[in-house]
Amino acid sequence: MPKYRSATTTHGRNMAGARALWRATGMTDDDFGKPIIAVVNSFTQFVPGHVHLRDLGKLVAEQIEASGGVAKEFNTIAVDDGIAMGHGGMLYSLPSRELIADSVEYMVNAHCADAMVCISNCDKITPGMLMASLRLNIPVIFVSGGPMEAGKTKLSDKIIKLDLIDAMIQGANPNVSDADSAQIERSACPTCGSCSGMFTANSMNCLTEALGLSQPGNGSLLATHADRKDLFLNAGKRIVALTKRYYEQDDESALPRSIANKAAFENAMTLDIAMGGSTNTVLHLLAAAQEGEIDFTMEDIDRLSRKVPHLCKVAPSTQKYHMEDVHRAGGVLAILGELDRAGLMNRDVDNILGLKLTETLNQYDIMLTQDEAVKKMFRAGPAGIRTTQAFSQDCRWDTLDDDRAEGCIRSLENAFSLEGGLAVLYGNMALDGSIVKTAGVDKDNLTFRGPAKVYESQDTAVEAILGGKVVAGDVVVIRYEGPKGGPGMQEMLYPTTYLKSMGLGKACALITDGRFSGGTSGLSIGHVSPEAGSGGLIALIEDGDMIDIDIPKRSMVLDVSDSELAARREVELARGDRAWTPKNRERQVSFALRAYATLATSADKGAVRDKSKLGG
């Protein structure tokens, strides 16, 4: 029978000092035999996805204590990728994931907490907490802050739906008036919550459902809706029961590595492909799998991408649907239900509810359930009122979207495409793979051949695009933006956005060893591995080299002879200590970022730290 971790600090005469300090936090004699559960919050006023979380930890804590546990809350950092975008701040985004994972480990292990409730929401916070959960392997429940409502405004006598990406595109479009641009900006992000499309934050919060670590509705129920409060209240109750299952009943099925096993990771990736999730999810799932010592690799992702259909198309791949529409159509479990009926789900997986997948679908898939309370929850909709307050409205759709032929979520027979929304491309440019969000690629662009225009930073690429130096047919190559070469693997949202602003969204391709925002669409290929900073072939491309992209064949090839590439490699190696670094780039890189770069692996490994360099 496992012993409560917290007993290390709460039992025995030698721990009198620790108990004295616990008493100073409000604990009493009666508390010293109870499980101590960490409420891992991420409130900050910097991030709209987290601005409403201040009091939500207290909600969870009250339920923990009412259910027989002791709750202790702490906060992690949280970076807003949208605000950090387009300047040096983006260098810090991906490295913040490792800091979040480490900070959770530090707090939980230093204080011997028995379990966790992770209150996350945005891009690197959910992945960081997920990595920590699988590293620590103690009972955990995830409950996120929820999606933002979609923006709406009236332009040219027509009501249109908006999100952050629209504000960025139209802000750089020379054909859009200042007045219209300002109106779009003011309407794009109307409420608290993670940005309203299937961007990285919402993708990851959906994936925690598929992994079995969060409750039904976690990925899609709006941040502003009163129903979301129940997720927080129930998380507090359920974590105590989950904790006691492990420590008092010796039930290892309550642990995250038992729940989020390889079969669950395959289910999560299958969901991601089917819903056209952010390419960043590939990085984060690979990283989390390594923390949990789960054998889940790029090869698994490639295998799944070839057989999973695209069943749900959401912004940025279309402006018709946002997360509020996914929820109305039944959310994550509706997509999993369609995938299950297509024979694509691993059914023998558990979740924090203590249910198998089939049991969960019978209760929560709107196409199967007879539970009116479940159907009511999925009718939770937007209010269209600007607010930073959680649970501030209780509006509902009159009906559910159960149209699996032409609705937001499709059946296999009516799939948007029989191949899913993400694909892994290989070739001499990416021996270890690269990622493209096929959900956002126009059908006419699935194959592309063009000359390279090479840039050694995002900044110079943006300058060239806005300056008219990139023309139709070009393949924009942005290198030395990988985990090591950046460092920090910046998102290339501005270059892809500005290609659209300049009318080149379907006329050019973009390839990078950096990554993309979940808001990116178009022929944008990222995560090229090995990266330029690690000696990858992307470092040897020259202006004018022809590049062939063939998504159906999963291929990306630089059309340059092996002998020429060998000669270029010799020239690069002759640079000595400066080899595999950008030639003409001025960038201030702090000591903290240099430390990250020293240990960073390429994207095919999840951009995690290289344990071999630490003797691991």
From Swiss-Prot:
It comes from the Bacteria. [2Fe-2S] cluster binds at C122, C195. It catalyses: (2R)-2,3-dihydroxy-3-methylbutanoate = 3-methyl-2-oxobutanoate + H2O; (2R,3R)-2,3-dihydroxy-3-methylpentanoate = (S)-3-methyl-2-oxopentanoate + H2O. It is an enzyme of class 4 (lyase). The active site is at S517. The modification N6-carboxylysine is found at K124. Keywords: 2Fe-2S, Amino-acid biosynthesis, Branched-chain amino acid biosynthesis, Iron, Iron-sulfur, Lyase, Magnesium, Metal-binding. Its EC number is 4.2.1.9. Pathway: Amino-acid biosynthesis; L-isoleucine biosynthesis; L-isoleucine from 2-oxobutanoate: step 3/4; Amino-acid biosynthesis; L-valine biosynthesis; L-valine from pyruvate: step 3/4. Mg(2+) binds at D81, D123, K124, E491. Pfam families: ILV_EDD_C, ILVD_EDD_N. GO terms for cellular component: cytosol. GO terms for biological process: isoleucine biosynthetic process; L-valine biosynthetic process. Homodimer. HAMAP family: IlvD. Functions in the biosynthesis of branched-chain amino acids. Catalyzes the dehydration of (2R,3R)-2,3-dihydroxy-3-methylpentanoate (2,3-dihydroxy-3-methylvalerate) into 2-oxo-3-methylpentanoate (2-oxo-3-methylvalerate) and of (2R)-2,3-dihydroxy-3-methylbutanoate (2,3-dihydroxyisovalerate) into 2-oxo-3-methylbutanoate (2-oxoisovalerate), the penultimate precursor to L-isoleucine and L-valine, respectively. This is Dihydroxy-acid dehydratase.
